């Protein structure tokens, strides 16, 4: 293996000169021994560019504090690799596959796979469509998730993406019982910490591998940690034939880290300052998240929408790869409707009669058309008031408000904040309940009884507590 010398340090980007016949390949991992107060630390770099004159430009996976010009850099001759297999379950890793949960180290005998891999070949892909029940009414009814599909949770800051992802982990991982991989990409360390302890308490952690590259880490780690998590998920799919759940929070931070690195590498920025390779990088990640004839990877990705602008290149690029989108809307959080999922903007290619069945399809479309009519009438109500509406329009508004409130739901993961038990509602119950609301069966129950409940049984119980005869 070649030995090079540091020639330049620019934050997380380091230039290294090698001998003429020893220049490392793109994506190779290099290591530097950096002296620190607590002892020598090994810093891993990844080759990003070959600049000519036997110099390579690399991205550091950790802090470059203490790195000086002239230091020796060793080429490992291989790419960054992470441990895979059953030994990863119940453990927490960083981008390099090192354990960070203060338990014993993973044995050297455990298989390690490189994080850069080709997407599965076209003839290996599976085209079967099966619905994945989440127990969340608004999702199951209006934008159902596909087993082995890619799902995006879109929303601005603080509208509930992480809470929704935690509820999905709670519901699907427990109901589905399969293996899950959670990749924390550039999000808050506190949230990752809370999630780890919650999953430990519920026992779900035994079937989960967690990989973190959080907000405080250099862009190199944030850019590569999603690939580390995906590599672990791919092993369970390809070698064990499992149906794997891959949670990524947050895919926007993957793009953001790529943008930081791109500027430091000296590439010309593209639209809104993003990297010119945005679509390529997103494609390389997303094309690997897929279902094959051996097993499936169902991915649920939180996508931060900067300034609530859906035309921003980062969320717009992610949109193109998804089978279902769950859009979170700030206006709904202001109305106290949680989860704040926009029932008209959320989409799924599974909402077809041939997939969900005729009754489910018709109820979902009727719910959406009722809500759309209500949205159109809101301007008239704001200017002239409810009294100016026809009787038919008044009925539409009243039913739409009941539907809007009934789309809200208590979450298991929010019990400590709300003091109310979470609810899991099967799809059949959801469809039947909304059909009854549309048919006017519950017009006599006040709309407040529909807020933050599970099934219609909860609404009736709440109405009785309010002193209403049901």
Curated annotation (Swiss-Prot):
Molecular functions per Gene Ontology: ATP binding; ATP hydrolysis activity; proton-transporting ATP synthase activity, rotational mechanism
Pfam families: ATP-synt_ab, ATP-synt_ab_N, ATP-synt_VA_C
Compartment annotation: Cell membrane
InterPro entries: AAA+_ATPase, ATP-synt_VA_C, ATP_synth_F1_bsu, ATPase_a/bsu_AS, ATPase_alpha/beta_chains, ATPase_F1/V1/A1_a/bsu_N, ATPase_F1/V1/A1_a/bsu_N_sf, ATPase_F1/V1/A1_a/bsu_nucl-bd
Annotated binding of ATP, by residue: 155-162
Gene Ontology CC terms: plasma membrane; proton-transporting ATP synthase complex
Catalytic activity: ATP + H2O + 4 H(+)(in) = ADP + phosphate + 5 H(+)(out)
Membrane topology: Peripheral membrane protein
Known EC number: 7.1.2.2
Enzyme class label: translocase
Domain of life: Bacteria
Keywords: ATP synthesis, ATP-binding, Cell membrane, CF(1), Hydrogen ion transport, Ion transport, Membrane, Nucleotide-binding, Translocase, Transport
Principal localisation: membrane
Keyword Ligase: no
HAMAP family: ATP_synth_beta_bact
Family: Belongs to the ATPase alpha/beta chains family.
Oligomeric form and interacting partners: F-type ATPases have 2 components, CF(1) - the catalytic core - and CF(0) - the membrane proton channel. CF(1) has five subunits: alpha(3), beta(3), gamma(1), delta(1), epsilon(1). CF(0) has three main subunits: a(1), b(2) and c(9-12). The alpha and beta chains form an alternating ring which encloses part of the gamma chain. CF(1) is attached to CF(0) by a central stalk formed by the gamma and epsilon chains, while a peripheral stalk is formed by the delta and b chains.
Purpose: Produces ATP from ADP in the presence of a proton gradient across the membrane. The catalytic sites are hosted primarily by the beta subunits.
Protein name according to UniProt: ATP synthase subunit beta
Organism expressing this protein natively: Staphylococcus aureus (strain NCTC 8325 / PS 47)
Gene name tied to this protein: atpD
